[in-house]
Swiss-Prot record:
Gene symbol of the encoding locus: ENOD40
Domain of life (superkingdom): Eukaryota
Swiss-Prot/TrEMBL keywords: Nodulation
Protein name: Early nodulin-40
Organism field: Vicia sativa
Role of this protein: Modulates the action of auxin, and may function as plant growth regulator that alters phytohormone responses.
């Protein structure tokens, strides 16, 4: 799931 991919990136920033 790409949603989890970019979502984790935003929350991990």
């Amino acid at each position: 799931m790409k949603l989890l991919c970019w979502q984790k990136s935003i929350h991990g920033s």
